[in-house]
Amino acid sequence: MSGHSKWHNIQGRKNAQDAKRGKIFQKLSRELFMAARSGGPDPSSNAALRLIMDKARSANMPKDNIKRAIDKADGSDGANYDEITYEGYAPGGVAVLVHALTDNKNRTSSDVRVAFTRNGGTMGAAGSVAYMFDRRGYIAIAREGLDVDEDQMFEDILEAGADDLQTEEDVFEIYTDPKELANVRDILEKKYTLANAELTMIPQNTTPVDPEKVEQFQRLVDALEDNDDVQDVYTAGELPEEE
């Protein structure tokens, strides 16, 4: 698969995310709530919930927090969220998708627009950049200590039902049809330790970020991710390699 490594993007922001752990738990709680409300509270029959529970555990979210978020889905506390996707461009014309879960659309729309305009970006209309991304299942397997070559891994992921493999120096990145992610994950984790498994949006093509605009680009992404209502930020930006 063409494009930059998603895993390196994940790792590149890990330290910053560690410093925002409370905010991450809040966002995961909303995802758990929505998955449980739409598909039921039993992870054995709700693949989407099972994936988000794994994501929450990977983030070291306490079990009580996970249970509490799922229990709220019975509607007893009146909570509800709308899913909204915002589209726009970062500095240099880099496509950006923003996925939010909000209880106040007007507030979130205003906040996202401000984040774009204050950091050199522009908010786009619905459909302006979404077509540049594909929804995919994504699995990462770290290569450290793993005695498996690319050919063997490719054979294993095809047998599991995945359809693409990107091999990096430190990680195998596996891509699946979104509907097959949970099943592929269940099969692969019988043989491998998975570093990550999630639904994501992958850019069909990447856009190099102008070295002079890297700082502004990262400020925009940070401003969007810092918003309590924003769950995920996807970009087509390819950052220059550090010297």
Curated annotation (Swiss-Prot):
GO biological process terms, semicolon-separated: regulation of DNA-templated transcription
Pfam families named among the record's database cross-references: TACO1_YebC_N, Transcrip_reg
Positions in coiled-coil regions: none
Location of the protein in the cell: Cytoplasm
InterPro entries linked: Integrase-like_N, TACO1_YebC-like_2nd/3rd_dom, TACO1_YebC_N, Transcrip_reg_TACO1-like, Transcrip_reg_TACO1-like_dom3, YebC-like
A GO molecular-function descriptor: DNA binding
Top-level taxon: Bacteria
Major location (coarse): cytoplasm
Record SUPFAM superfamilies: YebC-like (SSF75625)
UniProt keyword list: Cytoplasm, DNA-binding, Transcription, Transcription regulation
Family under the similarity heading: Belongs to the TACO1 family.
Name of this protein: Probable transcriptional regulatory protein LCA_1307
Species of the source: Latilactobacillus sakei subsp. sakei (strain 23K) (Lactobacillus sakei subsp. sakei)
Lineage summary: Bacteria, Bacillati, Bacillota, Bacilli, Lactobacillales
